[in-house]
Amino acid sequence: MVWLRLWAFLHILAIVTLDPELKRREELFLRSLGFSSKPNPVSPPPVPSILWRIFNQRMGSSIQKKKPDLCFVEEFNVPGSVIRVFPDQGRFIIPYSDDIHPTQCLEKRLFFNISAIEKEERVTMGSGIEVQPEHLLRKGIDLRLYRTLQITLKGMGRSKTSRKLLVAQTFRLLHKSLFFNLTEICQSWQDPLKNLGLVLEIFPKKESSWMSTANDECKDIQTFLYTSLLTVTLNPLRCKRPRRKRSYSKLPFTASNICKKRHLYVEFKDVGWQNWVIAPQGYMANYCYGECPYPLTEILNGSNHAILQTLVHSIEPEDIPLPCCVPTKMSPISMLFYDNNDNVVLRHYENMAVDECGCR
């Protein structure tokens, strides 16, 4: 189970330097969490405010003991288990110029490398482009967004690129982020050959009373323009409907040598993960420890199999061991982190914290 690997690995890692064997264990554990290797962000982008907001909402729900749906993003009302934000890696085609009366503020090619999305994942939402100039435009702008396509010319054996208009809107006041629905486009971009990016054009609003100040407005737009792409994906292999589990009563306090939950706080700084784990800084993982003596009482939360095993152990103690103290109820945690491509990711990981223990 994930928590067992986590506890054993972190417990050792916290007190010794990684030798080859521990390095291998770390790699295996990270792989089980969906990483190809240990992330090492060089110039990590800032965490988008929307991800901080969602993370804090989920932390509040966990404090209130609300069980989250690991395969549904309530904040966007779509199926999904992973939220990613991809920064724009494009370039300006026509940057701002010092024309006295500019007719176009800027033209920029937008490109989002979504190769971090695994082949098994299904894109359930592409929230579009977050256009965040962080500047209040006094008179508004005209905005156009195009998709870049590759068109094959019939009978000529070659192709050319063209643009398909996606959005054409006028914004009177732009003082907050803009989002456009690009779900279908993101789904097609999972084929890298089809990801030719987008083109963003911004024009000053055509009002003669404002054209004299358009230079300053356009210059500010380019200076403060920030674009990113937010996606929600669902991995069907990891989002199978869980089987109904037998419910057990909560364990009361028991003697120190009896099977029960023990406290274990994992601080990511202690194991050298603080560079890529953004939040939380640590969490209460807990673990199970203690004896499962014969006869098993109700407070030890034993299964039918464990009860029978203790009976057989009483007859053949040399051959049959006592049941083990293991988790019977676990809960997930949300983690905000940088992935192997320096993208900011918010993800639920199930079975990360022990809530109750019993003999099995």
From Swiss-Prot:
Tissue specificity annotation: Vegetal region of the egg.
UniProt keyword annotation of Ribosomal protein present: no
Positions annotated as propeptide: 17-246
Signal peptide: 1-16
Location relative to the cell: Secreted
An annotated Gene Ontology molecular function: growth factor activity
Annotated keywords: Cleavage on pair of basic residues, Disulfide bond, Glycoprotein, Growth factor, Mitogen, Secreted, Signal
Alphabetized PROSITE patterns for the sequence: TGF_BETA_1, TGF_BETA_2
Glycosylation: residue positions: N113, N181, N301
Ribonucleoprotein keyword on record: no
GO cellular component, one term: extracellular space
SMART domains, A to Z: TGFB
Similarity comment: Belongs to the TGF-beta family.
Name this polypeptide is given: Protein DVR-1
Gene source species: Xenopus laevis
